[in-house]
Amino acid sequence: MSVYFPIHCSDYLRSAEMTEVMMNAPSMEEIGLSPRKDGLSYQIFPDPSDFDRCCKLKDRLPSIVVEPTEGEVESGELRWPPEEFLVQEDEQDNCEETTNEKKDQ
């Protein structure tokens, strides 16, 4: 069983209420980003001069050199590609070489 309560409110009345809200709301000029009482101002976007100063401090990125090591894998260390993958690749290469040799003959 549903209960229906009709709301006796015309669209004109709702429109009048919205107009009243819009008329009483502060304008964008009043909302503007003015300095606060403590003297600090709001800043949304970074100051371009800060960007220039930051770039001058960073002439270049630090370089990190990583050299591969050929040694025993420590316990728990993962290597890529895994040795099983390398063995499978070698087998596939050998199969391809064999088929190419048969085609050449």
From Swiss-Prot:
Record field: compositional bias (Acidic residues): 86-98
Annotated region described as Disordered, given as residue ranges: 68-105
Tissue-wise expression: Expressed at highest levels in heart, and at lower levels in brain, spleen, lung, liver and kidney.
InterPro entries: LBH, LBH_dom, LBH_dom_prot
Superkingdom classification of source: Eukaryota
Coiled-coil regions, chain positions: none
Phosphoserine found at: 63
Keywords: Cytoplasm, Developmental protein, Nucleus, Phosphoprotein, Transcription, Transcription regulation
Subcellular compartments: Nucleus; Cytoplasm
Any single Gene Ontology cellular-component annotation: nucleus
Domain LBH intervals: 18-103
Location (main, coarse): nucleus
GO BP annotations, alphabetical order: mammary gland development; mammary gland epithelial cell differentiation; negative regulation of DNA-templated transcription; negative regulation of intracellular estrogen receptor signaling pathway; negative regulation of stem cell differentiation; positive regulation of DNA-templated transcription; positive regulation of mammary stem cell proliferation; positive regulation of somatic stem cell division
Family the entry assigns: Belongs to the LBH family.
Miscellaneous section: Mice overexpressing Lbh in heart exhibit severe cardiac abnormalities and dysfunction.
Function: Modulates the activity of key transcription factors involved in cardiogenesis.
Record protein name field: Protein LBH
Taxonomic lineage from the root: Eukaryota, Metazoa, Chordata, Craniata, Vertebrata
